[in-house]
A protein has these predicted regions:
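Domain-level signature for soluble enzymes in the chorismate/prephenate branch of the shikimate pathway
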Residues: 1-274
């Protein structure tokens, strides 16, 4: 059953055949998918109501966090994380048939296939999107160019799959946030995960004190990442996800964090991916 029947258009970053489009289709199989060239453009489309929601990658099990999406969640107002989907990533080397000496793909995909490329002496060439790289190879007709993308991209752009499952880790997967317009939900029934970010007070031990807000209440953090705060040397913004087993304890932890940190932004409270 479609969890969001009123959503008819869902955005993603990339071109048709991108992993992000696959994730969007998995979440909203009946909605029209709309690709955007950048994450910023996807957020703009959400704000202007060009799309009802956007499915955007926030972290990969090999490559780590997707910094730009996390930064935009902090910077943009009027949006929230209302769900998530974990999508397996199975990279393929695509080409026209001749030996590949250069592989075009998104930097994250290149990083995830580093061992495969190095073992074969294939040059990694950064491109804005995996599916876009496949399209460029198909249209460019440059000898020796190949792309790292999905099997779906190979089919869409008429390329051959030269090698499958070339990622360094077979458990490679990406977690996508379902972002829509609205106010982030508070902990409550049926909502089992929280995503937020905070800036710690600029004093010794501030991060430890902030994290104590969770540990004292038996809350399990499933993610903790940090990013430098622009124009504030040695200040950091921390990104946190945690599981909700007790909604009251989760609410208390959020209140305690607001007292301890300089700034807190709740991205959303939502059902965790199964």
């Amino acid at each position: 059953m479609d969890p969001h029947p009123s959503w008819t258009r869902v955005g993603y970053q990339g071109e048709p055949g991108a992993y992000s489009e696959e994730a969007a289709i998995a979440v909203l199989p009946k909605a029209t998918t709309v690709g955007f060239p950048t994450f910023t453009r996807a957020f703009d489309a959400l704000a202007s109501r060009e799309v009802d929601a956007a499915v955007l990658p926030v972290e990969n099990s090999l490559g780590g966090i997707v910094q730009e999406v996390n930064d935009l969640l902090w910077e943009r107002s009027g949006v929230r994380v209302s769900g998530e989907v974990v999508h397996p990533v199975r990279h393929c080397l695509l080409g026209r048939g001749e030996p590949v000496v250069r592989a075009l793909s998104h930097p994250q995909a290149l990083l995830q296939c580093r061992k495969f490329l190095e073992a074969r002496g294939i040059q990694a060439v950064s491109f804005h999107d995996t599916a876009g790289a496949a399209r460029a190879v198909a249209e460019g007709m440059v000898m020796g160019n190949g792309a790292i993308a999905s099997a779906a991209a190979a089919k869409r752009y008429g390329l051959k799959i030269l090698a499958e499952g070339i990622q360094d880790d077979d458990t490679n997967q990406t977690r996508f946030a379902i972002v829509d317009r609205g106010t982030p939900a508070k902990p409550g029934p049926g909502l089992t995960k929280v995503s937020l970010a905070f800036i710690g007070a600029h004093r010794p031990g501030s991060r430890v004190h902030a994290l104590t807000c969770f540990s004292e209440r038996g809350i399990n953090l499933t993610r903790l990442d940090s990013r430098p705060v622009p124009n504030q040397p040695w200040q950091y913004r921390f990104y946190v996800d945690f599981e909700i087993s007790d909604p009251q304890a989760a609410s208390e932890a959020l209140r305690a964090l607001e007292e301890e940190a300089t700034e807190v932004k709740l991205f959303g409270t939502y059902p965790a991916a199964e």
